[in-house]
UniProtKB/Swiss-Prot annotation:
Keywords: Auxin signaling pathway, Cytoplasm, Developmental protein, Growth regulation, Nucleus. It is found in: Nucleus; Cytoplasm. May play a role in the apical hook development. InterPro entries: SAUR_fam. The lineage of its organism: Eukaryota, Viridiplantae, Streptophyta, Embryophyta, Tracheophyta. Expressed in roots, leaves and stems. Disruption phenotype: No visible phenotype under normal growth conditions. GO terms for biological process: auxin-activated signaling pathway; regulation of seedling development. Belongs to the ARG7 family. It comes from the Eukaryota. It comes from Arabidopsis thaliana. This is Auxin-responsive protein SAUR32.
Length: 121
């Protein structure tokens, strides 16, 4: 079991089901995104995101901010525009990977070290 799976299971064990199941497609999860003082927005993300290094960093920041006892929907404490940027990076990698261009994926987790601090307000 990878780190992302452990994090996801921990969040699931400590949160209530506040989102209607029919509202979220199979294989996806609803989250809230927004930093302090910013209106939070709801996003539906594929569960595959939870194994991506960038998304794991966002989950780590959520853990640091709220702990594992946050109630309801998982909340990611970053600016919505920064989350959209991360989402575009993840989706771009997934489209390259799904397009059988496996040789274009380089670096693993280390390729994101320059982005680690960009999520903090």
């Amino acid at each position: 079991m990878g780190t992302g799976e452990k994090t996801l299971k921990s969040f699931q064990l400590h949160r209530k089901q506040s989102v209607k199941v029919k509202d979220v497609p199979k294989g996806c999860l609803a989250i809230k995104v927004g930093s302090q003082g910013e209106e939070q927005q709801r996003f539906i993300v594929p569960v595959l995101y939870f194994n991506h290094p960038l998304f794991m960093q966002l989950l780590k920041e959520a853990e640091d901010e709220y702990g594992f006892d946050q109630k309801g929907t998982i909340t990611i404490p970053c600016h919505v525009e920064e989350f959209r940027y991360v989402q575009a990076l993840i989706d771009g990698e997934r489209s390259v990977y799904n397009g059988n261009n496996h040789h274009h994926r380089h670096g693993g987790r280390d390729q994101y070290h320059h982005l680690v601090g960009c999520f903090r307000a």
